[in-house]
Amino acid sequence: MSINALFDEFKVKAATPKQQLAEYKAQGKKVIGVLPYYAPEELVYAAGMVPMGIWGSNNKTISRAKEYCATFYCTIAQLATICDTLRPMSQNFRVAMGDKMKVIFLAHPQNRFEEFGLKFCEEEYANVKADLEEVCGHEITNDAILDAIKVYNKSRAARREFVKLANEHCD
């Protein structure tokens, strides 16, 4: 497959997330919406589910965002990119959608180097893991988590290599 064919395929996938979601669901897969940037996608993947970013863009209509966000929220928050107004989004989802779906919150500690920060972080991930197990209906094993980490690390390495190569071809 040529590079241009790959780019064309990527453009279609990026422009049609609703279609991609429908394809996953048609395959019988559970899809978990994740807000950027700190969602533990590896845990979702290890559970056998698909992590799908809840993203937006400035060239998309965001009128439905007003159903979930206060009118004074900036479009950046409505489009689910990281900023101060993103912090309460999980609570907004919980209030608006909590009776329709499980909303899982993850608080990242500001200090992850002291013992108390590490303990807090470990407890937060354990809570997320337990919530995901409830959604997927089975235990997420340590082996599955390790395998998921390997998959994601390989993907990240490939993206870093792509950026390096793309930088050499700015023409």
Task: Label each PLM-derived region with a short phrase.
Residues M1-K30, E122, A126-D171:
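A charged, amphipathic alpha-helical module
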Residues Q27, A46, G98-K100:
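Short, well-ordered coil/turn elements that cap or connect secondary structure elements
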Residues I62-Y68, P109-R112, V135-E139:
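Short C-terminal domain-edge/linker segments immediately following a structured domain
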Residues A14-Q19, W55, K102-L106:
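Short amphipathic alpha-helical segments, especially helix-boundary/capping motifs
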